[in-house]
């Protein structure tokens, strides 16, 4: 087992300029996640949880700080390498209803990241979607359902 942490965040900051001044959404966050560990980020609405996740995945640029994934500085890699790294990273949002596209079916939502990666054929994607649904305990009958037609537990499993 490697001594390199899975994720290491050092003095991470994300500020937004607003008409009323600077909003410090993420301010000096530090943590390490080792292989096999899980981190839950909790807090009140609007405290920066989602922003923190988006900055770690480099969906938003940080204002300052460093983010390492398996020893690689996410803030300094090129687009191709970042896409590769993101295949092993995920945010599970607290509210599965708000994080799922209401215009897409369950199978379309699950297939979307596989399509974006452009590594699998249509048939392979369909097979992978079936396997994923089985793995998280989603019955085949919900594959053509929309998020609003499912309970919170099923929506959460789609996000995962």
Which stretches of residues belong to each language-model region?
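A short, flexible loop at the N-terminus of ABC-type nucleotide-binding domains that lies
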Residues: 2-6, 15-28, 35, 78-81, ...
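Conserved ABC ATPase "signature" region
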Residues: 73, 123-141
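ABC ATPase nucleotide-binding domain "signature" region
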Residues: 40, 157-160
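The feature captures the beta-strand-to-loop junction immediately N-terminal to the Walker
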Residues: 42-44
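Helix-to-loop junction immediately C-terminal to a conserved catalytic motif
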Residues: 57
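Conserved ABC ATPase signature
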Residues: 146-150, 154
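Conserved ABC transporter NBD signature motif
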Residues: 65-73, 85
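Q-loop/switch helix immediately C-terminal to the Walker
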Residues: 104-116
